[in-house]
C-alpha cells in the first residue's frame, strides 16, 4: 500500500468508520393478515425489513438502512427499519433487530425447527 500525502490544509484522515455492533436478531413469526408496522406500512413477512429494538437509545428512524451480517456464515443483506420491537437485553447478547421471516431465512436463520435467533453484526448505512 502506498501512502499519499493529503493536500495542504486538508484533514489528516477521515474519521474511522464505527465497528459493526454484534447482537441477536430474532424474527417475527406468523402475523395476522392486514397487520401494520409501527410506521403504518402493511406488514410483509417476506420483505427485507426489520423492527429495531426499543432498548436502542436513540431509536433508529423509520427508513434507516442497516446492513445485517450473520456472524456464523457471513451472509449479509440490507434491511429497512419500518417497525419497533419490544425486546429486552439478555445476558449473552443484546437483541437488536426483529427481522421478517424472509430476511431471517435469507441470512441463514432456521424457521423450522425455530432456532429463535441468530448472532449478527449490524451496520447503520443511513
Q: Where are the regions that the model predicts?
A:
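Secreted/periplasmic proteins
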Residues: 1-126
Amino acid at each position: 500500500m502506498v501512502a499519499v500525502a493529503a493536500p495542504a490544509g486538508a484533514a489528516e484522515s477521515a474519521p474511522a468508520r464505527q465497528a459493526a455492533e454484534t447482537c441477536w436478531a430474532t424474527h417475527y413469526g406468523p402475523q395476522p393478515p392486514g397487520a401494520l408496522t409501527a410506521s403504518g406500512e402493511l406488514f410483509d413477512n417476506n420483505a427485507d425489513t426489520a423492527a429495531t429494538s426499543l432498548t436502542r437509545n436513540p431509536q433508529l428512524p423509520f427508513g434507516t438502512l442497516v446492513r445485517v451480517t450473520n456472524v456464523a456464515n457471513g451472509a449479509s443483506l440490507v434491511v429497512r427499519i419500518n417497525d419497533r420491537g419490544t425486546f429486552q437485553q439478555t445476558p449473552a447478547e443484546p437483541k437488536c433487530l426483529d427481522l421478517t421471516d424472509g430476511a431471517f431465512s435469507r441470512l441463514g436463520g432456521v424457521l423450522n425447527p425455530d432456532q429463535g435467533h441468530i448472532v449478527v453484526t449490524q451496520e447503520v448505512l443511513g
